[in-house]
Amino acid sequence: MPDKRTALDDAVAQLRSGMTIGIAGWGSRRKPMAFVRAILRSDVTDLTVVTYGGPDLGLLCSAGKVKRVYYGFVSLDSPPFYDPWFAHARTSGAIEAREMDEGMLRCGLQAAAQRLPFLPIRAGLGSSVPQFWAGELQTVTSPYPAPGGGYETLIAMPALRLDAAFAHLNLGDSHGNAAYTGIDPYFDDLFLMAAERRFLSVERIVATEELVKSVPPQALLVNRMMVDAIVEAPGGAHFTTAAPDYGRDEQFQRHYAEAASTQVGWQQFVHTYLSGTEADYQAAVHNFGASR
């Protein structure tokens, strides 16, 4: 079996401006933040992003990397809850927003994973969701009669096809098999299966034998057929949680949100945390924690 290990920047070097990317995780939980920071270091722009959003989306918006977003929500999960950079991009019109129900996003990923053009869903009917889609979102009439007679109209959720997807898990092997050791898979497997290029980071790369002995079978969420490249990235989800390896860094998340409130504060944040390598970032975060 091939060894799929690579480096963060080498993985991101495969992106091109204008691509559609999926960012797995959920809000401020197990986000592939090391990959996000690598995208910030790149020249890639004009991205369409598909996400259950958190600071991953906020950071990309802060750097002007995003053109359009398909999202079920955007949340930091704890105070101040709403990501400041996404809020600015959304309200200023800097991005095209395709807001939807969480189930609709999952349905779109499922359609893409199954290589279907769309899947029917009731979510979104009777709501203002279609108004956010600029005519993209269509309905379909069921060819089968409903139990009470008549033919039901449903949302035809389009496949959310991804040029590339990024996910972060706790444990993996060099071939791309991986497991989560926390409490929730966060649909990470769907993001990977919906994509043409699949990139995974993990807290630790271990031997396959150790991987399968470390977790119950149902936690082996990702297999090697879903992954093109894997990166060992300790702290790769920071400042989101990657429990049980570490929780959300609440102090740093507040620091991020507060820094975004002024131009000077944000320039200092970028200089301190986002202008160097991933190793530089982790060292700066260590210094931040030591000073508190």
Swiss-Prot record:
<dbReference type="InterPro" id="IPR004165">
    <property type="entry name" value="CoA_trans_fam_I"/>
</dbReference>
<comment type="pathway">
    <text>Steroid metabolism; cholesterol degradation.</text>
</comment>
<protein>
    <recommendedName>
        <fullName>Cholesterol ring-cleaving hydrolase IpdA subunit</fullName>
        <ecNumber>4.1.99.-</ecNumber>
    </recommendedName>
</protein>
<keyword id="KW-0443">Lipid metabolism</keyword>
<keyword id="KW-0456">Lyase</keyword>
<dbReference type="GO" id="GO:0006707">
    <property type="term" value="P:cholesterol catabolic process"/>
</dbReference>
<comment type="function">
    <text>Involved in the final steps of cholesterol and steroid degradation. Opens the last steroid ring of cholesterol by catalyzing the hydrolysis of (3E)-2-(2-carboxylatoethyl)-3-methyl-6-oxocyclohex-1-ene-1-carboxyl-CoA (COCHEA-CoA) to 6-methyl-3,7-dioxodecanedioyl-CoA (MeDODA-CoA).</text>
</comment>
<dbReference type="GO" id="GO:0016829">
    <property type="term" value="F:lyase activity"/>
</dbReference>
<comment type="subunit">
    <text>Heterotetramer composed of 2 IpdA subunits and 2 IpdB subunits.</text>
</comment>
<dbReference type="GO" id="GO:0008410">
    <property type="term" value="F:CoA-transferase activity"/>
</dbReference>
<comment type="similarity">
    <text>Belongs to the 3-oxoacid CoA-transferase subunit A family.</text>
</comment>
<keyword id="KW-1207">Sterol metabolism</keyword>
<dbReference type="InterPro" id="IPR037171">
    <property type="entry name" value="NagB/RpiA_transferase-like"/>
</dbReference>
<dbReference type="GO" id="GO:0051701">
    <property type="term" value="P:biological process involved in interaction with host"/>
</dbReference>
<dbReference type="Pfam" id="PF01144">
    <property type="entry name" value="CoA_trans"/>
</dbReference>
<keyword id="KW-0153">Cholesterol metabolism</keyword>
<keyword id="KW-0753">Steroid metabolism</keyword>
